[in-house]
Regions:
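C-terminal single-pass membrane-anchor helix
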Residues: 165-219
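Non-cytosolic ectodomains/luminal loops of secretory-pathway membrane proteins
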Residues: 1-169
Length: 219
């Protein structure tokens, strides 16, 4: 059994509410080579987003290295957004790496069927590996060769070895609160009624207490 066969990847979500941490842990076990570089490839669903400005701050504070596959609209609701690619370049420490990625729930359409939460599932990321000493990789089952940016700076493309046999884990899920769509009409009607009532009261107050001079009103 080679050290590649002992690699395991697990993922969990910490914190509550709309703002969570997606924590991925990779355990390589004994025998992994020196100079091993790792890349986690997340394909995240449209129901969540990542704040690139927060990532820039975390890079300075913690050294977190993240490359987004495309620009992320922080304000867009879930139904107008698309899934997106996130490349995480974590640091390996004594055969174990842990990458903590801050994620945020998007606004979802209100439910007309009384549904209170929308379940957003996040699948396990792909794990790909490379070393500077091995530049000519050979594909052999169950592993395959893929191309990806060499570093987070995205200046060049390298060959990586994608690990295929990872332990199966069910997707982790988030419950995103939904608004009650059945309340839209009553709320709109109530808002309109209150607005009209305020206009009537304000107009009556101006009419009763205003001083009319040459077609002008002085309060």
């Amino acid at each position: 059994m080679t050290w590649l066969e002992t690699v395991s990847v697990t993922m969990d979500v910490s914190k509550n509410g709309f703002h969570r941490d997606l924590v991925t842990t990779v355990d390589f076990g004994p025998g992994f080579p020196d100079g091993l570089e790792t890349l986690l490839v997340h394909r995240l669903p449209s129901g969540i987003y990542i704040d690139q400005y927060q990532l820039a701050s975390l890079k300075e504070d913690t050294g977190l290295q993240v490359l987004l596959g495309s620009a992320v609209d922080l304000e867009a609701p879930a139904h107008t957004s698309e899934e997106f690619l996130v490349l995480v370049y974590p640091a390996l420490d004594q055969g174990i790496l842990k990458a903590t990625l801050p994620i945020h729930g998007r606004y979802h359409k209100p439910s007309l069927a009384g549904k209170r939460f929308e379940l957003v599932e996040i699948k396990l990321p792909k794990l790909i590996l490379r070393t500077d000493t091995c530049t000519q990789l050979i594909s052999f089952p169950p592993y395959k060769i893929v191309d990806a940016p060499c570093t987070v700076h995205n200046l060049s493309i390298c060959q990586w070895l994608e690990i295929q046999h990872l332990q199966e884990q069910d997707p982790v899920s988030l419950e995103i609160p939904l608004g009650d769509g059945s309340l839209v009409e009553p709320v709109c009607a109530g808002t309109l009624l209150v607005t009209l009532l305020c206009c009537v009261i304000l107009s009556r107050s101006i009419w009763m207490h205003g001083v009319f001079l040459d077609n002008a009103i002085l309060i």
